[in-house]
């Protein structure tokens, strides 16, 4: 804009730097009284200086006037090879970018693999202005997949700097989402590293692969955790992403229309949504510390029921690590309850089933209840108490509360049945004690005479041992 504020010194975008500290650009305010040209009598060098100052201050009218003079070319290069368009893009001056492009500036110009589009995506300015600059450059056929010397593409710079709408526009214009730079970073990795949750959600929605590793073997979730972005770590590690690839089927025009008509206020309210799905499989794996296996099981369409009935050879066939197999098998052994087929037993056998097998059944049933209690406690501790800390937007809480109410009813029914079982056992025990024909077990019989004999034997043995010790002591003396 013609009256925009003073811009900073131009530097190469995307982490690049010039070979000389003197880049040819000057900082300062123009004297408005001497700003206009007085005819065509000024020397060429003075016009170049005025042109650079006009670019610095964003004086569009002066830039147009100097270009109209015909002495300065729209693709003129200054020190370290930057053109006026590259400089205008570096300060996110959309109006200057439009003027220069309309005058024939080359949108595909690059210097040392630094493109104008990369410069715009890494510019210091508002996202609104950066978005306008990027849109103008893309409309003039700037390639969104040309990388810099570090193999970083425009979408990586936009993701690194937190420009959600720019990322979406680049993808709509053909940018590759899963391209990796020289360190193996993708746009998703950069967003996770910098803590831009909205970018992470948008990239997942656009088909980003969260399983691509860096050169040192790190996943985006691990990069987020290392930089203490715990929300993003949880988002990438413990949740499914049903919206992944949602926009890939849209045409370029449909996607651009969707992006440009988005209400900025809605965007600030987290319009990029997904749903956390904690099913029985996820809870089971989380309880064993095997969260990393969730994606593997989902890819192979293995349900919890199938997992619990797998044999050892099936674990190996499906690519389970030996350590993970041992954890699952140990858990299955603890949960195993021997099924008792009462209908196949004779009347005499039914009377005898109330022994060790029945006790073992009750003990295992009690252990399973303990596991269920622990699972619920773990979920309670994992859920944030503040709704603002929820990483993903959830469905209506009414759905969750209705299921919880059903759980409470089932627990109450279970409690009632267990109480009935307890009363029945107590009744059987009372009848047994009052039955005159009942013969107590051998271990239950403890007569007065047997107790006296046991105590006498112990006393005699102890006294004899004491005499033996005394005798040995006197002999030594």
Swiss-Prot record:
GO terms for cellular component: pi-body. It comes from Saimiri boliviensis boliviensis (Bolivian squirrel monkey). It holds the Pfam family Ank. Residues 274-336 form the SAM domain. This is Ankyrin repeat, SAM and basic leucine zipper domain-containing protein 1. Residues 1-24 are annotated as: Disordered. Gene3D superfamilies: Ankyrin repeat-containing domain, Transcription Factor, Ets-1. Keywords: ANK repeat, Cytoplasm, Developmental protein, Differentiation, Meiosis, Phosphoprotein, Repeat, RNA-mediated gene silencing, Spermatogenesis.
